C-alpha cells in the first residue's frame, strides 16, 4: 500500500510480556493471589493513555483486585516502569507525567461495569488527581466535578536542566483551559514534594471554545471559539522559559455551532469516549518544518453516497473542498474519514473506499495530489480501525495499542507509476516517489528505466521534462526553507483534465492575524509564507526567459563577429567549467557515452548564463544566506540537471548494449541505435521548451546516430527543423569517415551547405572536392561583395589575363580582382590565404565541368 506503517510500539509485544513476567515473579514469591491470570482474561483493560513529547508512552490496566495501575514505557531504553497504583475501581481516561517522572496527573470516572459501587463523591462525575510519584507520597485532588477533565503536562525543550516549576494544563468539558503552576522541591535526598500544595497558582488561558488540539512535539495549543457564529482558530505557543503567547487568530468558514465539544490529541481517544464526543465531525491542524499550516475538516456526513472534506491551506491563502463519490456503499460504515500528517503530504482515507494524498507544499494543481478510489488493493490494505495522527508522522491505533511511524512506500508508488493508466496518477505518483527518495540514486535509476520504456505513456505532460525538473528540485530542496518559492518543482503550469470521481472547489481565505511582532523557528517560516502570499506578484519561481534572450544575443553577436567584451564571455564560460567540474566530482566512474568530453561552446554559454542568472535570482531572494553556499546550490542544481540527462542516455546505451564503434560512420544504424536516437530526440524536445542546457557532446552524439539511422531526406528535414544540430565535431568525423562515393558526396554536400558559416569555413578545407572548392568560392565572393560599391570602370577587358573565352565569367573575375587590389577588399577568407579571384575562376570551371559530366 502507498502508506507504510512501521510499528514503534505494540502493547501486546512491548508491555504484556513484561506484565506477565512481573505477575510470575509475584506469584513465585507468594505475594500474588494465585488463580487464573487476570491479564489473560481481562486484556481489554490494558490500553494506552498518552504519548508524551519525549516519546514515552503511558498505559493503564486493572490488576486482579480491580485497582487502577499506571505504567510507562521508555522509548529510549525500551523498558517498562510501574508509576502508580490507585486503589479504587475507577476508569482512567486521561493521564500525563512530567518530564522528570516525579509527578503524575490523572482523571478518573466511575467504572461503567454493572454492579460496581460508586467510588466518587456524590455529585462528582470526574476525579482529577495530582500525585507525587518519586517516591509515591502525597495525592492532591485538583478537581472533583460533574464534567470531564483532561490533563497534560508541558514539556520544556531543555530536559537536561529540570525547571523548579512544572506546568499542567487542565481542559474542561465546560469549555475552559487552565494552566497550573506546580513548584516542587527535593527533600531527604531525592524525594520530590509539591510546595504549597494547598494553593497551586493557575491561569485561565482559554475559554468558551468548542474544539481544541494539542501538539505535543511543538508544545502548541490550537483551539476554536465562536464569535457571532464565526469559527475563529487561535494558537498558543508554550516556551521553555515557562511563558506562552497567543500567536495568531484566523476565521474559518466552517460551522461548529451544533457540533458539540471536541478534543484532539489530549491523550488517546479511547473508543469509549471517542464516540461520546466526536459526533462524526473530524477537524485537525497539521504543520511541518517548512512553515505550512493546514486545517483539515470533514463535517458530519449527510449521505454515504459521497464524502466531502475541506483543507484550509492557510500558508497559501486558499482552501480546497474535495467531494468524492463512494462505490459499493454498504450499511456497515466507519463513522468518519481519517486525516494523517505525512509532513509534505496529508493523507485522507476511508478504509475500503478511497485514499488521497494531498500535496501541502504545492497544492495549486490538482494533478500533484494522488486520488485512489474504488477497488484498489492499495486502499484495502489500510487499517480499518480509526487512527489518531500525533505530532510529526506518529500515528496511534487506540484499538490495538500500537504506535506507528507513517511513511510513504517507495515501492508501492513506483508500482502505481508503472501500472496506472491515468496521467494524473502518473504525475502524482512520480512526485510522491521523488519526495520519498529525495536524490536516492537507486530510486532515480528505477524511474529512468521505466521512463525509457514508456517515454510516450503520458499525453498530458512530458515525462522526461517532469522528471528532470522535479528530481533537480528535490536535490537542493533541503538547502533552504524558501526553495519551494524560488525553483519550479514541476514543468506543468496548468491542468484542466478532470480527475475521475473527484470534484474540487477552490476558494480564497483570510490570512491569519499574527499577534506577535518577532518570530523564530517555525513561526518565522510561516510568517514568510504569509508575506509571500500577500506580496509575491508575480511569483518568484525562476525561469530561463532572461537566459534565453541573452543566449540568443550572444549567438547572434558571434555570427556577426561583434561579440561584447572578452572578459564577460570568459566569465560565462568559467561558470560552465565549474558546473562540469562539480558534476564530474560527484560521478567518479567512467561514462559510457562521449558526453561532457567536447567544448560545444554554445551549450557552455547556455550553462554559464544559467549559473549567472540563477545565482542572481537566489541572491535577490535568499537574504542572510552565505554567497558561497548560494553558489554551491546553483552548481549542484545545474549539475543535477545535466547528470539526469547523462543518466537517461547512458541507461538506454547500456540497455541496448551499444559500443564505441557506433560513433563511426561505417554502417547503417541498427534498431538499438535508432532506439537511443529516439530517446535523445525526446530529451531534446523536453529541454528545448524549457531552454535547459544539454551536456556538451549531446548534439554530436545525436547527429551521428541520426546520420546512421535516418534516410537522407528525413535527416535533412530534422536538420532544417532544428531537431538535429550540426556540430563541428560531428561533421569533421563525417568528412573523415566517409569516402567520396556518389551517395556520400550527396550527403556531404547536403550537410556542408547547411553548416553555420564559421564552421563551414573550417570543414570545407577537409574535403578536397570540386563541391568544397565551390562552397569556399561562394563564401569568399559573398564576403567581397558585401560592401562593394559600383564605380565607373573601363569596358575593355584585358583578354590576355584569361584563358577562357566566356565573357560573363571573365567580367566577374575582373571585378573580383579589382576589389581584391583596392581598399574595398575585406580581410582574407579565414584559414584560406590562397583564396583569390584565380581560385574562384578555377573552382567555377571545375564545378561546371562536373555538372556537365566532362
From Swiss-Prot:
Q: Which UniProt keywords apply?
A: Golgi apparatus
Post-translationally, this protein is described as follows, namely: The protein is first synthesized as a holoprotein form of 98 kDa and rapidly processed into the gamma-secretase-activating protein 16 kDa C-terminal form, which constitutes the predominant form.
Write out the GO cellular component annotations.
trans-Golgi network
According to UniProt, the tissues expressing it are described as: Widely expressed.
Major localisation: Golgi
Gene Ontology biological process terms from the UniProt entry: positive regulation of amyloid-beta formation; regulation of proteolysis
Pfam families linked: GSAP-16 (PF14959)
> What is its subcellular localisation?
Golgi apparatus, trans-Golgi network
Question: GO MF terms on file?
Answer: amyloid-beta binding
> Which family does the record assign?
Belongs to the GSAP family.
Q: What else is known?
A: The gamma-secretase regulator activity is specifically inhibited by imatinib (also known as STI571 or Gleevec), an anticancer drug that selectively decreases amyloid-beta protein production. Imatinib binds PION/GSAP and acts by preventing PION/GSAP interaction with the gamma-secretase substrate, CTF-alpha. Its role as an activator of amyloid-beta protein production makes it a promising therapeutic target for the treatment of Alzheimer disease.
What quaternary structure, including any partners, is listed in this protein's UniProt entry? Interacts with APP; specifically interacts with the CTF-alpha product of APP. Interacts with the gamma-secretase complex.
| Function, in words | Regulator of gamma-secretase activity, which specifically activates the production of amyloid-beta protein (amyloid-beta protein 40 and amyloid-beta protein 42), without affecting the cleavage of other gamma-secretase targets such has Notch. The gamma-secretase complex is an endoprotease complex that catalyzes the intramembrane cleavage of integral membrane proteins such as Notch receptors and APP (amyloid-beta precursor protein).
Q: Can you say what this protein is called? A: Gamma-secretase-activating protein
* Organism listed in the record: Homo sapiens
The major lineage groups are: Eukaryota, Metazoa, Chordata, Craniata, Vertebrata
Amino acid at each position: 500500500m502507498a502508506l507504510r506503517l512501521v510499528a514503534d510500539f505494540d502493547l501486546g509485544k512491548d508491555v504484556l510480556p513484561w506484565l506477565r513476567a512481573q505477575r510470575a515473579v509475584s506469584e513465585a514469591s507468594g505475594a500474588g493471589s494465585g488463580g487464573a491470570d487476570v491479564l489473560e482474561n481481562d486484556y481489554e483493560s490494558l490500553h494506552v493513555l498518552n504519548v508524551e513529547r519525549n516519546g514515552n508512552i503511558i498505559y493503564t490496566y486493572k490488576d486482579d483486585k480491580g485497582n487502577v495501575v499506571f505504567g510507562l514505557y521508555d522509548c529510549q531504553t525500551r523498558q517498562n516502569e510501574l508509576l502508580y497504583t490507585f486503589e479504587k475501581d475507577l476508569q482512567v481516561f486521561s493521564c500525563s507525567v512530567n518530564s522528570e517522572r516525579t509527578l503524575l496527573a490523572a482523571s478518573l470516572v466511575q467504572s461503567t461495569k454493572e454492579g460496581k459501587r460508586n467510588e466518587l463523591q456524590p455529585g462528582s462525575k470526574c476525579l482529577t488527581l495530582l500525585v507525587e510519584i518519586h517516591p509515591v507520597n502525597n495525592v492532591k485532588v485538583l478537581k472533583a466535578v460533574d464534567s470531564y477533565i483532561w490533563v497534560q503536562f508541558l514539556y520544556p525543550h531543555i530536559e537536561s536542566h529540570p525547571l523548579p516549576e512544572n506546568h499542567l494544563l487542565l481542559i474542561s468539558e465546560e469549555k475552559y483551559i487552565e494552566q497550573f503552576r506546580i513548584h516542587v522541591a527535593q527533600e531527604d535526598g531525592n524525594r520530590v514534594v509539591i510546595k504549597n500544595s494547598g494553593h497551586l497558582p493557575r491561569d485561565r488561558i482559554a475559554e468558551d471554545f468548542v474544539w481544541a488540539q494539542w501538539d505535543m512535539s511543538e508544545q502548541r495549543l490550537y483551539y476554536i471559539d465562536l464569535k457571532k457564529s464565526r469559527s475563529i482558530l487561535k494558537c498558543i505557543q508554550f516556551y521553555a522559559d515557562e511563558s506562552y503567547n497567543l500567536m495568531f487568530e484566523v476565521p474559518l468558514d466552517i460551522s461548529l455551532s451544533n457540533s458539540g465539544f471536541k478534543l484532539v490529541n489530549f491523550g488517546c481517544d479511547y473508543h469509549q469516549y471517542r464516540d461520546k464526543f466526536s459526533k462524526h465531525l473530524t477537524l485537525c491542524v497539521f504543520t511541518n518544518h517548512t512553515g505550512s499550516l493546514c486545517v483539515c475538516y470533514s463535517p458530519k456526513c449527510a449521505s454515504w453516497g459521497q464524502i466531502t472534506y475541506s483543507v484550509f491551506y492557510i500558508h497559501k491563502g486558499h482552501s480546497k473542498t474535495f467531494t468524492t463519490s463512494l462505490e459499493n456503499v454498504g450499511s456497515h460504515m466507519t463513522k468518519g474519514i481519517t486525516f494523517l500528517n505525512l509532513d509534505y503530504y496529508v493523507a485522507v482515507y476511508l478504509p475500503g473506499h478511497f485514499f488521497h494524498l494531498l500535496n501541502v507544499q504545492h497544492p495549486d494543481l490538482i494533478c500533484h495530489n494522488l486520488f485512489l478510489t474504488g477497488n484498489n488493493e492499495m486502499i484495502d490494505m489500510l487499517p480499518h480501525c480509526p487512527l489518531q495522527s500525533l505530532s510529526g508522522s506518529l500515528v496511534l491505533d487506540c484499538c490495538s495499542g500500537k504506535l506507528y511511524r507513517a511513511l510513504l512506500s517507495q515501492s508501492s508508488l513506483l508500482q502505481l507509476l508503472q501500472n496506472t493508466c491515468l496521467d494524473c496518477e502518473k504525475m502524482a505518483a512520480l512526485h510522491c516517489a521523488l519526495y520519498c527518495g529525495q536524490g536516492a540514486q537507486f530510486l532515480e535509476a528505477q524511474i529512468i528505466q521505466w521512463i525509457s520504456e514508456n517515454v510516450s505513456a503520458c499525453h498530458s505532460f512530458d515525462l522526461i521534462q517532469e522528471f528532470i525538473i522535479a528530481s533537480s528540485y528535490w536535490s537542493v530542496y533541503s538547502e533552504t526553507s524558501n526553495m519551494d518559492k524560488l525553483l519550479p518543482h514541476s514543468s506543468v503550469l496548468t491542468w484542466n483534465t478532470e480527475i475521475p470521481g473527484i470534484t474540487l472547489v477552490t476558494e480564497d481565505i483570510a490570512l491569519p492575524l499574527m499577534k506577535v511582532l518577532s518570530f523564530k523557528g517555525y513561526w518565522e517560516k510561516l510568517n514568510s509564507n504569509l508575506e509571500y502570499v500577500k506580496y509575491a506578484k508575480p511569483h518568484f519561481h525562476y525561469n530561463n526567459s532572461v537566459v534565453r534572450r541573452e543566449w540568443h544575443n550572444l549567438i547572434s553577436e558571434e555570427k556577426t563577429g561583434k561579440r561584447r567584451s572578452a572578459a564577460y564571455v570568459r566569465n560565462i564560460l568559467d561558470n560552465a567549467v565549474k558546473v562540469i567540474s562539480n558534476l564530474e566530482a560527484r560521478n567518479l566512474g567512467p561514462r559510457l557515452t562521449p558526453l561532457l568530453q567536447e567544448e560545444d561552446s554554445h551549450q557552455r554559454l547556455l550553462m554559464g548564463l544559467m549559473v549567472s542568472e540563477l545565482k542572481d535570482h537566489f541572491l535577490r531572494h535568499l537574504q542572510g544566506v552565505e554567497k558561497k553556499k548560494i553558489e554551491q546550490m546553483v552548481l549542484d542544481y545545474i549539475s543535477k540537471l545535466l547528470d539526469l540527462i547523462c543518466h537517461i542516455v547512458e541507461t538506454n546505451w547500456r540497455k541496448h548494449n551499444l559500443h564505441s564503434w557506433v560513433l563511426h560512420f561505417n554502417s547503417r544504424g541498427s534498431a538499438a541505435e535508432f532506439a537511443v536516437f529516439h530517446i535523445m530526440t525526446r530529451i531534446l524536445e523536453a529541454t528545448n521548451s524549457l531552454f535547459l542546457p544539454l551536456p556538451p557532446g549531446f548534439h554530436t552524439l545525436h547527429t551521428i546516430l541520426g546520420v546512421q539511422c535516418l534516410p537522407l531526406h528525413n535527416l535533412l528535414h530534422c536538420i532544417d527543423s532544428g531537431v538535429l544540430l550540426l556540430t563541428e565535431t560531428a561533421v569533421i568525423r563525417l568528412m573523415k569517415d566517409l569516402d567520396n562515393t556518389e551517395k556520400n558526396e550527396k550527403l556531404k554536400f547536403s550537410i556542408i551547405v547547411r553548416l553555420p558559416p564559421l564552421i563551414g569555413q573550417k570543414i570545407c578545407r577537409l574535403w578536397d572536392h570540386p563541391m568544397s572548392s565551390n562552397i569556399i568560392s561562394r563564401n569568399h565572393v559573398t564576403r567581397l561583395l558585401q560592401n562593394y560599391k559600383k564605380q565607373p570602370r573601363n569596358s575593355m577587358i584585358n583578354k590576355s589575363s584569361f584563358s577562357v573565352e566566356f565573357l560573363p565569367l571573365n567580367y566577374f573575375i575582373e571585378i573580383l580582382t579589382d576589389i581584391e587590389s583596392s581598399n574595398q577588399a575585406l580581410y582574407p577568407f579565414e584559414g584560406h590565404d590562397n583564396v583569390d579571384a584565380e581560385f574562384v575562376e578555377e573552382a567555377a570551371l571545375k564545378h561546371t565541368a562536373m555538372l556537365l559530366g566532362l
